[in-house]
Design a protein with these regions (language model features):
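Bacterial N-terminal signal peptides that target proteins for export
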Residues: 1-12
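Acidic, Gly/Ser/Thr-rich repeat motifs that build Ca2+-stabilized beta-propeller blades
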Residues: 25, 29-30, 35-196
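Beta-propeller blade signature
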Residues: 141-150, 201-215
């Protein structure tokens, strides 16, 4: 008798649970559970708008402003030019900030690939430029250039090479450079190129390819 009572109690509890689940809280008594509302999207809204529509550049590789100066933009072109123009939506002309087209090898994935203003520019009138230089073999140059007109232009003849790195291939030639908040200059030169990373440069901590250096 006791066993039958336990079975009856268990059956009653199960039926009650099923009945509650079928109710679902719907107001129409139909027993249908509404699906949960989808989570609100947290993705940012991105709008692409054309700016400086009156300006055109040849294979631009870098776009940046000098420290503390929002009045101008500087554009590096693959062929070895750095051009400057006013930060005005209606700007229609640009001028040459630096021209080293005569020494830059812009073939393959090389060219003028990066530049960085000294953090105190133009008080300290130095700009660092990273590019691949014409000649054989192909070599990446990290050089310092000076301004003698309060930062309006750079002197091509003032070039002071800081570091040179041999490039065994004409692809994967890196060259982005920037100053960190610690005041050091950081630079990379790519992984040395070649299909399938044949030299394993990225895993070699004694090789400047596939690395970031500080100066």
């Amino acid at each position: 008798m006791g066993r039958n009572r336990i079975l009856l109690n268990a059956t009653a509890s199960l039926l009650a649970t099923m009945a509650l689940a079928s109710c679902g809280g719907g107001s129409d008594g139909g027993g249908t559970v509404a699906p949960p509302a989808p989570p609100m999207s947290t993705a940012p809204t991105i709008v692409v708008s054309r700016v400086f529509a009156a300006l055109t550049f040849s294979q631009p590789t870098v776009l940046k402003q000098a420290p503390g100066d929002s009045s101008r933009w500087f554009v590096g072109e693959k062929n070895g030019l750095i051009r400057v123009f006013a930060n005005n939506p209606s700007a229609s002309s640009s001028s040459t900030f630096l021209d080293i087209t005569g020494v830059v090898d812009a073939s393959g994935e090389g060219g003028l690939l990066g530049f960085a203003f000294h953090p105190d520019f133009p008080i300290t009138p130095e700009v660092y430029v990273s590019y691949t230089r014409s000649g054989a073999p192909l070599v990446s140059y990290l050089s310092r250039f000076l301004s003698n007109d309060n930062g309006l232009t750079l002197l091509p003849g003032s070039e002071d090479p800081i570091l040179t790195v041999l490039q065994p291939q004409t692809n994967h030639n890196g060259g982005d450079i920037l100053f960190g908040p610690d005041g050091y200059l950081y630079a990379g030169f790519g992984d040395g190129g070649g299909s399938g990373d044949p030299l394993g440069n990225g895993q070699d901590d004694e090789n400047l390819h596939g690395a970031i250096i500080s100066h």
